[in-house]
Design a protein with these regions (language model features):
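Carbohydrate-associated surface elements
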Residues: 25
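Gly/charged, well-structured mid-domain segments that form the phosphate/adenylate-handling core
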Residues: 140-143
Length: 411
């Protein structure tokens, strides 16, 4: 499921009180800015592993409580449920019998204590929330409840595999050991590394979350998130009308020798990791009289790779060398993007042969709950031929330096 997206509903009826506030929404920017002091930011990171940001669910919950009549009224009556999408689905699927979430989703709310794996009273107080508003935190392959899909199934089936989409993709890629890394290219991008059973010390713009807790065994992850990947290509198609089909971007970009000095910084809702600047907005820089549609398209493709390189640099600084990254998501089929990303990172990218890695990961969690014991089989994933770095180091440095100058212009 989507992780940071915030949902609110009445406990008594199960009816939603407001539209879901998606993970991309920055409406709580002013709220987090008001909370931001060096001391507060340090405490938030120490407790939750996350940067104080409207990206995470806590600020969205607080915004809903302060600005929407429905949630405020339900809270006054003790009838308010806040949750991420998994908690909402579990509640609905079980007919209101289970108000639960798993540790991977809970760790992305900015309310979970990463050491105790329970809701933090300190963070609840910071955001003006109450524990009773939040679901019970469970292991990722707990028995969350049963559902017959309102009679569509002949009998109730157990719900016993729940994971945030990015963590599920890490599991689906078979990254069970410390240092295993994956790159999920969807609406946005997640670059994630298995950090092992001990909470890692991460620095810079990287955050720490819970990967999963399966059969009592805990996995932490280090991660960097990029806001616009597939969404950037959709913008080229639907808003600028530079392409008719999203699949066209790779061949068009590959048809140029280079970007012609054009850089696109897709900060439509701010810059995510490693910058965490919600106040920055998008820009296209370096346009000249010879710049055309193709240069903007290539600049968009390259921007995805440059942002991944930004995150990769921070991850290797915190977690050590990462010689291989598994890639999943729709953009894994874009050969230009895969090769250019491998060139910028200086490491091999191996696209997954499976299309829906997040679903596979959640399914694996459920299988472990139901008694499957072939854990080595989880790591035996099939991947397509990899993309290895092929660009000359001097050219790579020139390209990446141009990107860093473009970003610096906006900061």
């Amino acid at each position: 499921n989507q992780r940071e997206t915030a949902v609110c509903w009445r406990r008594s009826t199960g009816l939603p009180l407001y539209n879901a506030v998606t993970w991309q929404c920055a409406r709580a920017e002013e709220l987090t800015r008001a909370l931001s002091t060096p001391e507060t930011e340090e405490r938030v990171r120490a407790v939750t592993g996350l940067r104080l940001s409207p990206y995470f669910s806590a600020a969205k919950f607080a915004w809903l409580l302060k600005n929407a009549d429905g949630p405020a009224g339900a809270a006054a009556e003790g009838d308010l449920c806040f949750g991420t999408v998994d908690a909402w689905l579990i509640y609905r699927l079980t007919g209101g019998a289970a108000f639960k979430t798993d540790v991977s989703n809970a760790s992305r709310t900015q309310l979970l204590d990463l050491d105790s794996l329970d809701w933090s009273p300190e963070m609840l107080g910071l955001f003006g929330l109450e524990r009773r508003m939040l679901p019970e935190v469970c292991e990722s392959n707990s028995l969350f409840g049963y559902s017959d899909l309102d009679g569509l199934l002949p009998g109730p089936v157990p719900i016993c595999g729940v994971l945030g989409d990015s963590q599920a993709a890490l599991l689906g890629n078979g990254c069970l050991s410390r240092g295993g890394a994956k790159l999920t290219l969807g609406t946005g991008t997640s670059v994630m590394v298995n950090a092992g059973p001990a909470r890692p010390g991460v620095s810079g713009g990287i955050v720490c979350s819970v990967g999963w807790k399966l059969n009592g065994r805990l996995c932490y992850v280090a991660e960097g998130n990029i806001n616009h990947t597939g969404a950037l290509i959709v913008w080229l198609r639907d808003k600028l009308r530079l392409i008719e089909n999203s699949r066209d971007v790779g061949p068009i970009a590959a048809g140029l020798e280079d970007n012609g000095g054009v850089y696109l910084v897709p900060a439509f809702t701010g810059l995510g990791a490693p910058y965490w600047r919600g106040d920055v907005r998008a820009a296209i820089l370096g346009l000249g009289i010879g710049s055309g549609r193709e240069h903007v398209i290539r600049a968009a493709e390259e921007a995805v790779a440059y942002q991944i390189a930004d995150v990769y640099g921070e991850l290797t600084a915190s977690c050590g060398p990462i010689p291989l990254i598994y890639a999943d998501g729709g953009a894994k089929h874009d050969s230009f993007l895969m090769q250019f990303t491998a060139d910028m990172l200086g490491c091999e990218l191996a696209p997954s042969e499976v299309e829906e890695l997040s679903a596979l990961g959640a399914g694996c969690a459920a299988m472990l709950a139901l008694g499957w014991t072939d854990e080595p089989g989880l790591a035996a994933r099939r991947h397509l031929p990899g993309f290895r770095p092929a660009m000359e180091p001097a050219r790579r440095e020139r390209c990446y330096e141009g990107w860093k100058r473009a970003v610096k212009t906006l900061l």
